[in-house]
């Protein structure tokens, strides 16, 4: 490197260090084509794109290419590879970075940054076995590591062969690290004993927008008795990401606070100042959670519900809301929280005011039997692929796949498709549908299907409610814990126990049998919608009363 190039590199380093990303990009652009610059200049330029929050996908893909060039010019420059991995989590494009990371890992098997990066890539691609194996390797090397642990713990819900005992053990280990970090045992904060005029209830979530959580939550918020309860929404969603549903929720609540920019300490202080009777966490280990806030006592009573259907393992989370289809009484020791049972179902769906028509003609005119699964692609486990493959190979059928997640792109879809093809399924039998932005258009897609196949061990929830609402029955698998039994509870609440499979063999048998039934359209379709809309699945009025009673009992007990 010449003296001039060194001076430029030092200048660009200082700009990067001072977060002057646009200035850095401007200075480099003035030098001419980025392809003609020194590797270090390329590295700083790409880093400025990655670190700038406003960078668009096209820019991020350029940054990835530049990091790749720098790494290939010097295989020992691992920071460029680390950065390329980090960019891939924003673009969800892994086809180039994964082979490079695996090759580097062969030479650097103890590099924890590579281990974590590859584990997370496998997580996004739905390769649960590989992901969990690498995460375990990472935490064996770094047992006290807290940062970045959420994908590992939450991924245990997606993988077959992970028992509830094993899941709880990992939760307790993670929770103990967080509790030790904040010295929970010696937190002497005392709440104000002054009684609130109404029962003061707050819900914290990053999903107060067009999201499954809000579609379930809105019905409760609309109907809960505001003369008894003061309802406050704590939004961990960036203000720029709020939408029409966010604003609708704002209007229904007594108070709304945007806290995405709050530090954990500031948020704990703020929540405690509200003197809440009850704080609901609607996130668990999912994206946008404030786990390290919930781990500290922020309200007199803290409850987990709706957004995450399993234990979190922390001492300061008092209750987990379920129903008796989800958790058996002899399983209470497998959940850190005390279990609160709602009498019928643990949540209820608020359907759109105007539902699309159920059009059976399209199904009748199709000689090929059509299965569908509109679940998040990451729920399609290897076990699910194996079972579905058996069904597809033994029937004249096709499978429609679609996800409501905007972030799921080609690499994940291609990975799923490869798994089916490797199982002997014809490429033509797997059809990926485009994501529909409008809920009405999304629901109409169910008219293309005869029956919905549920994923396992992580079943669909929103998609099952939607399918049934559109007259499409759902074949689900018997589960072993709260999360994996959600499909069971849904089917039991519409008295369709016959569509709960006992095991893999039974699942295949039931699916194949369904393709041979001639009167499916008379049994399901419009009759199923009518049955469902009058069932506990959509009975918001009764659900809210049961929910209110539960809250009053909790406050009285406290």
Residue positions per predicted region:
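Alpha-helical solenoid repeat scaffolds of the TPR/TPR-like class and their adjacent stem/linker regions
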Residues: 1-368, 424-425, 437-449, 463, ...
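Short hydrophobic signal-anchor/transmembrane segments that target glycosyltransferases
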Residues: 71, 220-227, 382-396
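A conserved nucleotide-sugar
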Residues: 228-232, 389-422
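Active-site donor-binding acidic/aromatic loop of nucleotide-activated sugar
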Residues: 258-260, 412, 428-438, 456
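Short Ser/Thr-rich beta->loop micro-motif in glycosyltransferases that lines
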Residues: 283, 454-460, 478
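Donor-sugar nucleotide-binding helix/loop cap in glycosyltransferases
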Residues: 453, 467
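Short hydrophobic beta-strand element within catalytic cores of glycosyltransferases
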Residues: 473-482
């Amino acid at each position: 490197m010449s003296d001039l190039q060194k001076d430029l590199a030092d200048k660009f380093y200082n700009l990067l260090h001072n977060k002057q990303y646009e200035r850095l990009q401007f200075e480099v652009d003035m030098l001419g084509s980025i392809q003609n610059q020194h590797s270090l200049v390329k590295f700083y330029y790409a880093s400025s794109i990655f670190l700038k929050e406003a960078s668009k996908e096209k820019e991020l893909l350029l940054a990835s290419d530049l990091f790749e060039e720098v790494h290939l010019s010097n295989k020992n420059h691992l920071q460029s590879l680390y950065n390329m991995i980090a960019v891939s989590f924003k673009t969800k494009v892994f086809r180039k970075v994964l082979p490079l990371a695996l090759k580097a890992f062969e030479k650097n098997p103890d590099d924890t940054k590579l281990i974590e990066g590859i584990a997370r890539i496998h997580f996004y691609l739905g390769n649960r076995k590989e992901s969990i194996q690498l995460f375990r390797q990472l935490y064996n090397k770094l047992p006290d590591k807290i940062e970045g642990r959420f994908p590992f713990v939450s991924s245990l819900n997606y993988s077959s062969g992970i028992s509830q005992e094993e899941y709880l053990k990992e939760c307790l280990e993670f929770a103990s690290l967080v509790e030790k970090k904040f010295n929970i045992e010696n937190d002497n904060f005392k709440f104000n004993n002054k009684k609130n005029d109404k029962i003061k209830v707050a819900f914290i979530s990053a999903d107060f927008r067009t999201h499954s959580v809000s579609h379930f939550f809105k019905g409760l918020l609309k109907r809960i008795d505001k003369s008894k309860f003061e309802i406050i929404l704590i939004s961990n969603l960036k203000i720029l990401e709020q939408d029409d549903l966010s604003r609708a929720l704002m209007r229904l609540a007594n108070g709304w606070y945007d806290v995405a920019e709050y530090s954990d300490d500031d948020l704990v202080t703020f929540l405690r100042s509200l003197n809440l009777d009850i704080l609901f966490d609607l996130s668990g280990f999912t994206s946008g959670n404030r786990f390290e806030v919930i781990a500290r006592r922020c309200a007199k009573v803290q409850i987990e519900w709706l957004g995450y259907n399993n234990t979190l393992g922390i001492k300061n989370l008092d209750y987990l809301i379920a129903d008796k289809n989800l958790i058996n009484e002899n399983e209470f020791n497998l959940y850190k929280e005390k279990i609160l049972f709602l009498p019928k179902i643990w949540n209820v769906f608020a359907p759109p005011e105007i539902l699309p028509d159920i059009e059976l003609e399209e199904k009748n005119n199709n000689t090929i039997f059509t299965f569908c699964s509109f679940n998040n692609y990451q729920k399609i486990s290897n076990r699910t692929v194996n079972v579905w493959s058996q069904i597809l190979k033994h029937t004249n059928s096709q499978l429609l796949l679609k996800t409501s997640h905007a972030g799921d792109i080609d690499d994940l879809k291609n990975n799923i498709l490869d798994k089916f093809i490797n199982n002997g399924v014809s490429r033509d039998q797997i059809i990926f549908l485009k994501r529909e932005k409008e809920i009405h258009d999304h629901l109409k897609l169910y008219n293309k299907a005869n029956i919905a196949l549920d994923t396992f061990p992580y079943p669909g929830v929103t998609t099952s409610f939607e399918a049934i609402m559109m007259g499409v029955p759902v074949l689900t698998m018997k589960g072993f814990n709260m999360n994996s039994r959600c499909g069971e509870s849904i089917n039991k609440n519409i008295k369709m126990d016959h569509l709960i499979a006992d095991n893999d063999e039974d699942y295949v048998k039931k699916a194949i049998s369904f393709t041979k039934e001639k009167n499916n359209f008379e049994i399901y379709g419009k009759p199923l919608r009518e049955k469902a809309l009058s069932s506990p699945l959509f009975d918001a009025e009764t659900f809210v009363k049961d929910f209110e009673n539960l809250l009053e009992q909790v406050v009285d007990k406290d």
